[in-house]
């Protein structure tokens, strides 16, 4: 049975994290040649490449499995070594989260854990349809995802749902929808997406107004908070979580343009098994807060 030296695994991890051999060497305080030798040693052990030498480098499927193993070992070490030793060096906790969860419920959910535990968060923001892939690749130890099925050697629990409303300012509605939200009017109304893979707005319009993808003008903005600002200032109509704009809806600063119509995204918490003590604390905090503020029906 092949048992990798975790020092060599850390070299592989550093190349991926630092996006190259030179910065990985600086991070590990060794030469670039030493980094290459350690990775070559791993590849010889497993008889196959562990890195695709692109810019930046990316792990092969076997490399992903080894990185996932390293993440589990790092967390389990925290539990076995005890508080006295781990308290001096905060544990790095890498999580993949969607921007809307980060902008609404995730940080309050983790506030007590962060206050009571020696943790350094590394939050990697990704669309909720793709966060699970980061867990699969071993880049993170936990992920908030819309995927209900657990990966091999992982655990999953339902958190609850975010309900997305189609909203805009009153001025925007008066300008683009003077006769209500119609198929013809939507073709001229500017929209916004998080990135080129974000299809929520398009899916909502296709489902409810039979508009094909790509038929409406759409800005690309990688910020959940910017969606709210764009809607408030009358620049676009947006799909925004109800949880994020409760005050704006109550004050009338934003209005629900299609009352009774919404998009629901059920969220799930994925992490490696077995869980370390620290990860159990994180899991308990996320589930408790998620069940409190997210839709459960």
Curated annotation (Swiss-Prot):
Residues 4-60 form the HTH lysR-type domain. InterPro entries: ArgP, ArgP_gammaproteobact, LTTR, LysR_subst-bd, Tscrpt_reg_HTH_LysR, WH-like_DNA-bd_sf, WH_DNA-bd_sf. The keyword Transcription applies. One of its GO terms (molecular function) is DNA-binding transcription factor activity. It holds the Pfam family LysR_substrate. Gene3D superfamilies: 3.40.190.290, Winged helix-like DNA-binding domain superfamily/Winged helix DNA-binding domain (1.10.10.10). It comes from the Bacteria. Residues 21-40 bind DNA. Controls the transcription of genes involved in arginine and lysine metabolism. Belongs to the LysR transcriptional regulatory family. Homodimer. This is HTH-type transcriptional regulator ArgP. The lineage of its organism: Bacteria, Pseudomonadati, Pseudomonadota, Gammaproteobacteria, Enterobacterales. The gene is argP.
């Amino acid at each position: 049975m092949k048992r990798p030296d975790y020092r060599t695994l850390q070299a592989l991890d550093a190349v991926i994290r630092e996006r190259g051999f030179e910065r990985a060497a600086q991070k590990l305080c060794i030469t670039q040649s030493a980094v290459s030798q350690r990775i070559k040693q791993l590849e010889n052990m497993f008889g196959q490449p562990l890195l695709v030498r692109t810019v930046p480098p990316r792990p092969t499927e076997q490399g992903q499995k080894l990185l996932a193993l390293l993440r589990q070992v790092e967390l389990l070490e925290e539990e076995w070594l005890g508080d006295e030793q781990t308290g001096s060096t905060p544990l790095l906790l890498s999580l993949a989260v969607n921007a809307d969860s980060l902008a609404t419920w995730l940080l309050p959910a983790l506030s007590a854990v962060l206050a009571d535990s020696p943790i350094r968060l590394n939050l990697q923001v990704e669309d909720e349809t793709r966060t699970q892939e980061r867990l699969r690749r071993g880049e993170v130890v936990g992920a908030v995802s819309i995927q209900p099925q657990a990966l091999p050697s992982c655990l999953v629990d339902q958190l609850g749902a975010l309900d997305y409303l189609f909203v805009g300012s009153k001025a925007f509605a008066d300008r683009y929808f003077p006769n209500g939200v119609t198929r013809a009017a939507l073709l001229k109304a500017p929209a916004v997406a998080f990135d080129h893979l974000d299809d929520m707005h398009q899916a909502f319009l296709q489902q409810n107004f039979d508009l094909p993808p790509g038929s409406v003008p759409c800005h690309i903005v990688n910020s959940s908070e910017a969606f709210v600002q764009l809607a408030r200032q009358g620049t676009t109509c947006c799909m925004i979580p109800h949880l994020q704009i409760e005050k704006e809806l109550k004050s009338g600063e934003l209005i629900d343009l299609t009352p009774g119509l919404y998009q629901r995204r059920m969220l799930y918490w994925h992490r490696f098994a077995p869980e370390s003590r620290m990860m159990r604390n994180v899991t308990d905090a996320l589930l408790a807060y998620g069940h409190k503020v997210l839709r459960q029906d």
